[in-house]
Design a protein with these regions (language model features):
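Extracellular LysM carbohydrate-binding repeats and other cell-envelope/extracellular binding modules
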Residues: 2-26
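Flexible, surface-exposed loop/linker segments and immediately adjacent secondary-structure boundaries
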Residues: 14, 22-161, 166-177, 182-202, ...
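Flexible, low-complexity linkers/stalks enriched in Thr/Pro that connect modular domains
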Residues: 181, 190, 276-288
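Extracellular fibronectin type III
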Residues: 184-185, 266-280
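Conserved aromatic anchor
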Residues: 208-220, 301-313
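Short beta-strand segments within Ig-like beta-sandwich modules, predominantly Fibronectin type-III
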Residues: 236-243, 330-337
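Surface-exposed, short loops/turns at beta-strand junctions within beta-sandwich domains
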Residues: 249-258, 343-351
């Protein structure tokens, strides 16, 4: 501490000491919200469906499936929102000084996560996300990390983040992003591109389709759209990626939602996001029981449905969901005819469900 006299400490002097001198104890994280297929691995290596509200310990891993999400809260009130098809290992969860200082280190095995770190602004907090290609050390509060195929992307939404590899490091300031490939040094930070602009988005739907459009951008190579029940997308309903600025939100149940969208450039760097709240209010009546689809019909894409003709003024809505509760729609057809062929759907480890509505 460079004291002029080691035997005298003046009133008001600030001293630095190693964390190893402080009492340390294991901390726990908490799954505060889950939506869809969220799995947690116990310390013996077995996987099971996660439950909202359960504690997560050092050494445990969480993975999130298609059209699913999870929110994790840590000892210093930091929050991590896991996006679809992401996987995170709790590498270190510790607290010092009676819980005032936290040391949180996470391993992002793959996928996209969004972080709001140290929201209380306490000094001495440590929050790191380790990817296969780099380490993101937080010196700010809000940032995004995405790890795919040996490449990591990082964007700082508020504060600053140090992105480091064995080959070098960069300091990514607020409003900038960087990328790094395995075994290389991070690229110089680039300004995050502006969010896409909606074209007169509807705030309430009383009929199909639930369509949204954005202003076309020639330099954009892709569009990502998400629908969730909250603005953070911790209660995600669906995600869609396309090469055009158009999105049909599908056969959503009645209720309030948020639509979030961003663009991707030719290097895969995401833009800022745009958020739009909307409501669905389309009266409908379930026709018969919900049908559990046999896996071989789904994988072959050869299932045909014959429907009874309806009286004038009534229409069919046919819908397929990933879950039995109808919260995760993957396909729908409004104003369906009396003969309908279902498309081929991606394989999953539990049955799809078919819903037939009259509206």
């Amino acid at each position: 501490n460079r004291l002029p006299n080691n035997g005298v400490i003046q009133v008001g002097a600030q001293l630095r000491m190693p964390l190893s001198w402080l009492a340390v104890k294991q901390a726990q994280a908490k799954l505060t919200a889950i939506s869809g297929d969220v799995q947690i691995q116990d310390l013996k290596g077995a996987w099971r469906q996660a439950q909202a509200g359960e504690a997560v310990q050092t050494g445990q891993q969480i993975k999130v499936g298609i059209n699913s999400s999870a929110r994790v809260q840590f000892a210093d009130a930091s929050e991590l929102v896991m996006q679809p098809q992401s996987s995170v290992l709790m590498d270190t969860l510790s607290v010092y000084a009676g819980g005032y200082m936290a040391d949180t280190q996470l391993r992002l095995q793959g996928g996209r996560v969004e972080v709001h770190a140290n929201p209380q602004g306490r000094q001495g907090q440590k929050f790191e996300i380790i990817t296969p290609a780099a380490v993101a050390s937080v010196r700010g509060t809000q940032f995004v990390v995405d790890a795919q195929n040996g490449r990591s992307l990082q964007q700082t939404l508020e504060g600053q983040v140090a992105l480091q590899t064995t080959q070098g490091h960069v300091l990514v300031q607020e409003g900038f992003g960087s990328a790094v490939k395995l075994g290389e040094k991070p690229i110089a930070p680039e300004v995050i591109k502006p969010a896409p602009v909606f074209q007169s988005p509807a705030s309430r739907f009383v009929d199909f389709p639930m369509a949204f459009k954005w202003v076309a951008q020639t330099e954009v190579k892709g569009w990502v759209m998400q629908v969730g029940r909250d603005a953070q997308m911790a209660q995600l309903v669906l995600t869609h990626q396309a090469d055009s600025p158009f999105f049909d939100a599908g056969g959503l149940a009645d209720g309030r939602y948020y639509l979030r969208a961003w663009t991707l450039d030719d290097k895969g760097m995401p833009s800022k996001t745009v958020l739009h709240p909307f409501e669905v209010d389309i009266p409908r009546k379930l026709q018969g029981a919900v049908i559990q689809l046999a896996p071989h019909y789904v994988s072959m894409g050869s299932m045909t449905i014959d429907l009874v003709p309806l009286p004038p003024g009534q229409r069919y809505l046919v819908q397929v969901t990933r879950d039995a509760e109808g919260r995760q729609p993957v396909w729908y057809q409004a104003n369906a005819g009396v003969v309908l062929s279902l498309p081929q759907l991606p394989a999953q480890d539990h049955p799809y469900h078919l819903w037939i509505w009259i509206y």
